[in-house]
Amino acid sequence: MATQEFQAETKRLLDIVINSIYSNKEIFLRELISNASDAIDKLYYKSLTDNSLDFNKDDYYIKITVDKENRQLKISDTGIGMTRQELEDNIGVIARSGSLDFKKANEQEIKDGHDIIGQFGVGFYSAFMVAEEVTIISKAYGSDHAYKWESEGIEGYSVSPTEKESVGTDVILKIKENTDDEDYDQYLDEHRLKSIVKKYSDFIRYPIKMDLTKSKPKDDNEEEYEEYIEEETVNTMVPIWERNKNELTDEDYKNFYRERHYGFDEPITHIHINAEGTISFKAVLFIPERPPFNFYTKEFEKGLELYSNGVLIMNKCPDLLPDYFSFVRGVVDSEDLSLNISREMLQQDKQLKLIAKNIKNKVKKELKNVMENDREKYEEFFESFGTLLKYGIYSEFGQNKETLQDLLLFYSSKENKMVSLDEYISRMGEDQKYIYYATGESVERIDKLPQTEFVKDKGYEVLYLTEDVDEFAIKMMGSYQDVEFKSVSSKDLGLDSEDEETSDEKEKEYKGMFDKMAEILSDKVNTVRASERLKDHPVCLANEGEISIEMEKVLQSMPNNQNVQAEKALEINVNHDVFDKLTEAYEQDEDKFKLYTDLLYNQACLIEGLPIEDPVKYTNNVCKIMS
């Protein structure tokens, strides 16, 4: 029995595989099971045109058998089998369509095996990652002869006649001995093998059978147990996404959510997709109630389970979800994707991009549906993931705002709950020009801000923005339904004031005093002026430029900040008793005037939650006033 040499590129591949340090060696079982499933598929397709072949699905299966004593693992199928010529031609992906890609990779001097295995997959040859010797015994449908293919690796292979009663293929692996770095015994452990099947091949359409060791009480003594062997089908076969959604209950989806370990919570909703057309795929997606513990950390990996025809390609495919929907969990299955498609190829895959676009639109539609029909659930969701949606608007220069802006919720001055932008717009007065908002650390603090007095007294609703990202997202949006956003701290609120004439008169009358205050505070504010917005409070800070005071606080808190400063105006309530004291000091006592100016500025800072530059000086000034 002559040994034949492998082709040069196949020999190089085998050398890489055999000596590979690739950590994910368990995928060999996925590859061999997929080959077995394909073999049964071929027999099924043949039965469609061959009347003499009666295909009964119950007769077709894949069997995994362990022989620990001889360190053998056997994967058998009842598929179409292979002739001698097919054994010569068809063993391994690289021997066929993969050879050109392999040559390209070889030219790039890929050395460690990770790229080869990850990029191209290695099909049958992956068996050599865990086996020192591989034997294939196969009998083709319609043939009276069976053949044995044997190889110990790069030295070559042999093909010889053998005996086999039934049509199909047995792949027998002689598992390697353990090393200091690798535990190969695990591939002879039935429970470990079962877990690998569940992970990668749970939804193969044919039964995957194993003889499993179990125990039961002895007949004569229930306190003692005896072991027995029972054949068990270890895969689910028909995944939930292949079933008719009209036949499934909410409990079916919840059970699947738990079985796949998507979370300890319950999903607030699910999405079952069966898309046909330019790209065909099926998916079951879940929107969880709460984020996982590591969701807002670098350790979190977004992505959906990606299957090709029931076989897991990638445990988490990040390209299926935009970052702002990274909370979505679930599975996608498409027959249009290659089993061995790599991460690099997926990123360029047009079909995958079409799937991702479809998923994005479905998730958006479902979130909007929950928002409109189950507000309580949506608010629970928004409490967990609303921040992510806002970052989605702010990032990428606002290009996602059309997708996300109608999903936002904010606290409101008129409602003791969160409101949407649509709800705000629907309640606007006829003469209202803007969507008004105020920023702060909490609803309670914002509600007491002096800047909100004037707008609320006009009867207008104010949105309360309590998160760091809120105003950045609002600035990126600019407007909603052609209505511009306006901070209550802006210079021009677009509102008529009964005190406007008084303020203008006082502004002119006391221009010298305001200019002097601005000079004293020249390194802190851009201007000092009479306020049109203040009612009960003596003083406040207002925004002069694009960067607001709240944005300044956020930017200042970041590492490597560039000391970004908001342009500020100090506004004085000319109708407050304090104003009379201020003018009196301006006219009579320069030192007291400087003291009052400093106190009023620091008071305004405290209201805004800004730090006081010199707390000791401030407390001393307060003591001077009191003494």
Swiss-Prot record:
UniProt-recorded Gene Ontology molecular function terms = ATP binding; ATP hydrolysis activity; ATP-dependent protein folding chaperone; unfolded protein binding
Kindly indicate whether the keyword Lyase belongs to this entry.
no
Q: Where in the cell is it found?
A: Cytoplasm
**Region of interest (A), residue spans:** 1-343
CDD domains (alphabetical): HATPase_Hsp90-like (cd16927)
Q: Which residues form a coiled coil?
A: none
- This protein's record includes keyword Nucleotide-binding: yes
Q: Which GO terms describe its cellular component?
A: cytoplasm
Specify the superkingdom: Bacteria
Give the region (B) as residue ranges.
344-553
Instruction: Fetch the Pfam families from UniProt.
Output: HATPase_c_3, HSP90
Q: Which InterPro entries match?
A: HATPase_C_sf (IPR036890), Heat_shock_protein_90_CS (IPR019805), HSP90_C (IPR037196), Hsp90_fam (IPR001404), Hsp90_N (IPR020575), Ribosomal_Su5_D2-typ_SF (IPR020568)
Keywords in UniProt for this one?
Answer: ATP-binding, Chaperone, Cytoplasm, Nucleotide-binding, Stress response
Q: What is its main location?
A: cytoplasm
Ranges where the record places region C: 554-627
Q: Which HAMAP family match?
A: HSP90
Question: What is this protein's function?
Answer: Molecular chaperone. Has ATPase activity.
Record text on subunit structure and interactions: Homodimer.
**Which family is annotated?**
Belongs to the heat shock protein 90 family.
| Name of the protein in its database record | Chaperone protein HtpG
Q: Which organism is it from?
A: Natranaerobius thermophilus (strain ATCC BAA-1301 / DSM 18059 / JW/NM-WN-LF)
Gene behind this protein: htpG
